[in-house]
Amino acid sequence: MTRGRVIQVMGPVVDVKFENGHLPAIYNALKIQHKARNENEVDIDLTLEVALHLGDDTVRTIAMASTDGLIRGMEVIDTGAPISVPVGEVTLGRVFNVLGEPIDLEGDIPADARRDPIHRPAPKFEELATEVEILETGIKVVDLLAPYIKGGKIGLFGGAGVGKTVLIQELIHNIAQEHGGISVFAGVGERTREGNDLYHEMKDSGVISKTAMVFGQMNEPPGARMRVALTGLTMAEYFRDEQGQDVLLFIDNIFRFTQAGSEVSALLGRMPSAVGYQPTLATEMGQLQERITSTAKGSTTSIQAIYVPADDYTDPAPATTFSHLDATTNLERNVAEMGIYPAVDPLASTSRALAPEIVGEEHYQVARKVQQTLQRYKELQDIIAILGMDELSDEDKLVVHRARRIQFFLSQNFHVAEQFTGQPGSYVPVKETVRGFKEILEGKYDHLPEDRFRLVGRIEEVVEKAKAMGVEV
């Protein structure tokens, strides 16, 4: 076990000098453990990660927790290995920090639990699955217009309070119930309150037993926020590679991962790049994103909440993320204001999987016709607002008539919201979704009142609601 000494502390960055020419490898974890000798000192149990070799037997490291109380001359021990975290069944239903230590007050992880290093190479080219397979979510608007790919990366855009968390919970619920799949949630640099709320909501909705949670929140040093996404990814990779599972990995928020890297970049002595970001931005993002993929054994599908600074989509942080995405789900406040939940914008959400060779010709044609109808309705709204419906041609009246039914039919009740709404949630298979929208486009339900289409699952539920109202079907 090699020992060194702290020679410089610059906020979250610590320089350590080793004796006898021994230098720990890049990414090795170093430990500083110090017992307070008087009331002016504090107990220190700190993990550092080696980032640079400076020469002269000195390394520059990033601290995974606060460096308060650290002084020059303190002893540092090289663990001889990278940070490693527990993986497997022991992680389910638990909450961890970046080092894989439980923070939910539910007891320690067994000492014999398997631990894997957080830095690992991406799967080799020959290990990747070549088939593109759709991940059925049971959420109509997603499955029809912006389908998710197994092993794909999905960007989730949305402001505060439009339903990102509820959508995430429903996806976790549906993957657990319908696919028996595991979910891993990585809270990266977001509010502690939101993490706490999410944990308790998951407990209440019963999906926590199929979920592992990892947090490195806003109040933590940049080292923790930089590495916590890798901790979550390592836990997800075990379920994919060792158990052949289809795993959902949620990262909230991927922008904070980049932000944390930029905070320490200048302190590490790197020359800033565009807008002050780290010069290694694309490399760091690539190392994370390339590990999220489908292999012959299983898949890791990632849903990443993306904050766009000052709504500037050309900012290097979101722009670098976009190049990795397979699909986007855009949540919009104006959709939520119409009482349509999930508040997904059907025209702004996209997916590279919406192609006839992947989803099939019928699904593709129905989805495109739905988008055309909604786009035409959007164009007509100004005319309707000024002149009213009577001034429209018969053809345009029919477009508006069907578009409103489509809009409402894109909504549905969620299982995880059942305790608030009192309405049972619905999981709609893709085939049923496509059939329902096809029949609406064909005019089969033009005679039914449009409010009957709101917050239902399959198209049969619309017919039943209309019958209950006394409408002749």
UniProtKB/Swiss-Prot annotation:
Key words, A-Z: ATP synthesis, ATP-binding, Cell membrane, CF(1), Hydrogen ion transport, Ion transport, Membrane, Nucleotide-binding, Translocase, Transport
SUPFAM superfamilies cross-referenced by the UniProt entry: C-terminal domain of alpha and beta subunits of F1 ATP synthase, N-terminal domain of alpha and beta subunits of F1 ATP synthase, P-loop containing nucleoside triphosphate hydrolases
Binding site for ATP: 158-165
Pfam families xrefs: ATP-synt_ab (PF00006), ATP-synt_ab_N (PF02874), ATP-synt_VA_C (PF22919)
Record's catalysed reaction(s): ATP + H2O + 4 H(+)(in) = ADP + phosphate + 5 H(+)(out)
Location of the protein in the cell: Cell membrane
Annotated membrane topology: Peripheral membrane protein
EC number annotated for this UniProt entry: 7.1.2.2
Domain of life: Bacteria
Gene Ontology CC, one term: plasma membrane
Gene Ontology molecular-function annotations: ATP binding; ATP hydrolysis activity; proton-transporting ATP synthase activity, rotational mechanism
Location, primary (coarse class): membrane
NCBIfam families (UniProt xref): atpD (TIGR01039)
Function: Produces ATP from ADP in the presence of a proton gradient across the membrane. The catalytic sites are hosted primarily by the beta subunits.
Family statement: Belongs to the ATPase alpha/beta chains family.
Assembly behavior: F-type ATPases have 2 components, CF(1) - the catalytic core - and CF(0) - the membrane proton channel. CF(1) has five subunits: alpha(3), beta(3), gamma(1), delta(1), epsilon(1). CF(0) has three main subunits: a(1), b(2) and c(9-12). The alpha and beta chains form an alternating ring which encloses part of the gamma chain. CF(1) is attached to CF(0) by a central stalk formed by the gamma and epsilon chains, while a peripheral stalk is formed by the delta and b chains.
Name under which the protein is recorded: ATP synthase subunit beta
Protein's organism: Bacillus caldotenax
Name of encoding gene: atpD
